[in-house]
Amino acid sequence: EVRPFPEVYERIA
C-alpha cells in the first residue's frame, strides 16, 4: 500500500 506524504496526508485529512 502506497501512502501519501505527510504534506498530502494533512491536506486530504
Swiss-Prot record:
One of its GO terms (molecular function) is growth factor activity. This is Snake venom vascular endothelial growth factor toxin IC1. Its main location: secreted. The keyword Repressor does not apply. The lineage of its organism: Eukaryota, Metazoa, Chordata, Craniata, Vertebrata. The modification Pyrrolidone carboxylic acid (Glu) is found at E1. Expressed by the venom gland. Keywords: Disulfide bond, Growth factor, Pyrrolidone carboxylic acid, Secreted, Toxin. Homodimer; disulfide-linked. Interacts with high affinity with KDR/VEGFR-2, and with a lower affinity with neuropilin-1 (NRP1) and neuropilin-2 (NRP2). Belongs to the PDGF/VEGF growth factor family. Snake venom VEGF subfamily. The keyword Secreted applies. It is found in: Secreted. Snake venom VEGFs may contribute to venom dispersion and prey subjugation by inducing vascular permeability and hypotension. This protein induces vascular permeability through VEGF receptor (KDR/VEGFR-2) signaling. May also induce angiogenesis through VEGF receptor (KDR/VEGFR-2) signaling. GO terms for cellular component: extracellular space.
